[in-house]
């Protein structure tokens, strides 16, 4: 008897739980037929003058039935003496707001793009995103490069939430962009403006889905309800790390709606993307002889291999209506363990997550905390003492968890984000949110 057959006949009572009354086979491929469709990317008309510090907008044209991905293109010129650059296309896109029928649906910020990338993109996706939005660090002054910034609104992330323009006959969909007045290494060198810096050019491309007649009619005539995600951000708080003591701070969380996670970072408001004392560097802290000019260079690879000891947060906890939601945990727990348990990625130092959901990156809801039903929510923070000479990285890494480099006192902007669920209702040619703040 063949050896495989001996395994096959070795069948007992326990096997019933695995193979009794089988529901699938691995040896017959099953597929499903899909509705006929086509996708085309079409450039939009920009209203306003594109330039540093300006605001522009675009009204999504009615070229197709649904819209999904949106990519913003910038052409930037490396300016003057160069200066340190770090994701300049992100930095330039200071914020972008989505509006339907005059109602704000969502708003994203350049720091949120950086935080989202740090938390949710993995390996090749993160590297490819960097290629789209950052210099590769060897361009000469005067070099031009075309950058691509994909938007991350709810309908940009899955075709199942594609926005049905065909059902919004009476409401327009608009995007409002605010462009930053200063971009490191483009028109600003870290301390002053770069003379003669070239203005950016900008274009907006939208992916349209064209449906076949029967499905197009259904989308146009039937009402729709979409479970969407929104970003809540109430503005930067002022962080208060100290060079002489372990300072503490309580931050009121003014959020609403069922929320699946909180994400926060401490950043240097004059150096985009710097979330640690030494500006997020991967291998520059390997020895005591590293020059200061090297250790303050941002991590272009964004590999997340740098040490949490360079971050300013010592510990944190959340309180709901005066009750501890959980015991005080170290900052490294929110940077390492929480992302590991809920997302599975490697998060750069200085970016923190607390998830109420089992799988916060998934479209399927898997847990929330309803902040609309909480009167008083507080994020309690304790900072490290920022007292060690930043020019000696080995001294920083060789010390205790409660101290860090003196340059961590520059991390004075605290950005806290909440990602919540809401319902977008579309009927009678109009769309709007089911629940307001």
UniProtKB/Swiss-Prot annotation:
Induction: Expressed in the late phase of the viral replicative cycle. Glycans are attached at residues 280, 302, 399, 406. Its main location: virion. Myristoylated at the C-terminus. Glycosylated; highly branched oligosaccharides. The pattern of glycosylation sites are unusual. GO terms for cellular component: viral capsid. It is found in: Virion. InterPro entries: Capsid_N, MCP_C, MCP_C_sf, VP_dsDNA_II. Keywords: Capsid protein, Glycoprotein, Late protein, Lipid-binding, Virion. GO terms for molecular function: lipid binding; structural molecule activity. The keyword Repeat does not apply. The keyword Glycoprotein applies. Major capsid protein self-assembles to form an icosahedral capsid with a pseudo T=169 symmetry, about 190 nm in diameter, and consisting of 1680 major capsid proteins trimers. The capsid consists in 5040 copies of the major capsid protein (hexamers), 60 copies of the penton protein (pentamers) and 1800 minor capsid proteins of different types. The minor capsid proteins form a hexagonal network below the outer capsid shell, stabilizing the capsid by binding neighboring capsomers together. The viral capsid possesses up to five major capsid protein variants. They behave as asymmetric capsid components. Belongs to the NCLDV major capsid protein family. This is Major capsid protein.
